[in-house]
Amino acid sequence: LARETGAEVVQVFISNPRAWSGPRLETAQAFGAEWREAAIGPLFVHAPYLVNIASPNPEFLSKSIELCRRSVAACGVIEAGGFVVHSGSGGEAEVADALDRSATVLQATLAETPDETQLLVELMAGTSGAVASTLGEARALFDAVDDERLGLVLDTCHLFATGYALDEPKGVDAMFEELRQLDLADRLRLIHMNDAKFERGSKRDRHEIVGEGGIGLEGFGAIVRQPEVRDLSVVVETPSSGERRRLELETIRSLAA
């Protein structure tokens, strides 16, 4: 599928994304062998949707920790470049408590993460209770974790839903300047390049095909021309597939040309 669409970077789930079952080691070993033989490019693994590293529910939090631990072990087997996990949501709990839980889980997961895989935290879409959606909140989380091995993932739809003006070149410039001022630019490891179905600041995480949503081609053109993005891995998580996905990737490449 990656070859059919012209993809050079791939992100996958290595277990059922809607279950706590976690990855099977023998399956990871088989996939890893096939992936290395394919020699397509960087590989990233996304945490299952159920994982919430800031959950105030002790049982849910314990399950999230265990699933992260098993997932990063499997990432080492398949030699994935990064394991992506959302910053988490504390619901109605105090923000400081949710931040502490998220940081503690990230620290514990880092201790289990193999050298060939980097733990990456993805900012959320400004939803209620989210630990980190803004760059300032990301800085607070990175300070709490206090580990240089932790990397950052930015999702363009999430940022737009949070309120960043990514539909305007000057808004894109301002966001990346904030990233630099907060000393987060050198922690950026991956971009999830998704357009947004809803308007800026909606706090709604619904992805749209690049160029067909609220951010638009002008916004994405400004994003891909940022120096931090030019040599960065980019993953598309939109509703496109097959030939439509191939054309979408070509559009993104043309914006960067």
Q: Which functions belong to the PLM regions below?
A:
Residues 8-13, 43-45, 151-156, 185-197:
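Non-cysteine beta-strand/loop elements that form the S-adenosyl-L-methionine
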Residues 243-257:
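C-terminal helical cap(s) of enzyme catalytic domains, especially alpha/beta-barrels
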Residues 1-47, 51-73, 257:
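N-terminal pre-domain/capping segments
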Residues 96, 131-139, 160-231:
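Gly/Pro-rich active-site loop or hairpin
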Residues 2, 46, 64, 75, ...:
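Conserved, mostly hydrophobic/aromatic
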Residues 53-152:
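Active-site acidic/histidine proton-transfer and metal-coordination neighborhood
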Residues 15-17, 48-50, 88-90, 122-128, ...:
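Active-site beta-loop-alpha junctions enriched in small/polar residues
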Residues 27-45, 102-116, 139-146, 214-226:
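Alpha-helix-loop-beta-strand connector modules within alpha/beta enzyme cores
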